[in-house]
Amino acid sequence: MMLHWRPTILACLPLWLTGCATVTPAPQIAPQVALRVCADPNNLPFSNQAGEGFENRLAEMLADGMGGKVEYTWWAQRRGFIRNTLAAGRCDVVMGVPAGYGQALTTRPYYRSSYVFLSRADRRYRLHALDDPRLATLRIGVHVLGNDNPPPAMLLAQRGITGNVSGYSIYGDYRNPNPPAVLVDAVARGDVDVAIAWGPLAGYFATRASPSLEMTPVDQPADGTWPMQFSIAMAVRRDDHDLRQRLDAMLQQKRPQIDALLRQYGVPLVADTSLTDASLPGTATPSR
């Protein structure tokens, strides 16, 4: 979910802004600086190889603001993604990680979203709480990550709701476009009555589904054991403070455009007054 700095430019003003001074009067053209991004080539609404995801478009927006362009390394988002990409030096930026993610240095958040209930609009469930008694009998679909369960599945299990819950792999069938969309498709077909999914994913595919689907945010349980909301940031290597600072400045500068982009993709946004989330537990990350 970077800019590649060279020691030879340290004595110059930033190349992406002005170019270096020279001893000749001829005008100099600053070379473009690459924002090297590692991303999943088949993971809409976040990213794909055609550049159709909102993280693709955000990366382009930031690179353009820095006077450069995006260079991608494509890598399926699986266990070990950060280790095999960012930490291995294949790129300088990964988009879409929880703010405070422990395996990297993270930027300021650029949005905050929530898990949501997703159901067919004609059912009129209008669910909000995991303690709603109807969840004991409704057929529920959730994303799963291998042997790991995301927060909704854990909270349902804590309430003894397991027998009527079906798991859909967040990885899906990678041979097909948009593998995570299988959960939304299950709701539209009527295979499950309601799904609990990460809001950005659900919002994007719900607007394209037929019949119409209804989406409502999941209320945060009173015990607070598993968060339902997350602030999302970008990851850089732990020692790359300079790049983080530049990305932070660009995120602040592009705030209105970023909000408009997220709304265009149907991302349900949650107000975030602090934009400074503490480090989040690795097991409590949104599934995507």
Label each PLM-derived region with a short phrase.
Residues W16-G19:
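C-terminal motif of bacterial Sec signal peptides marking the signal peptidase cleavage site
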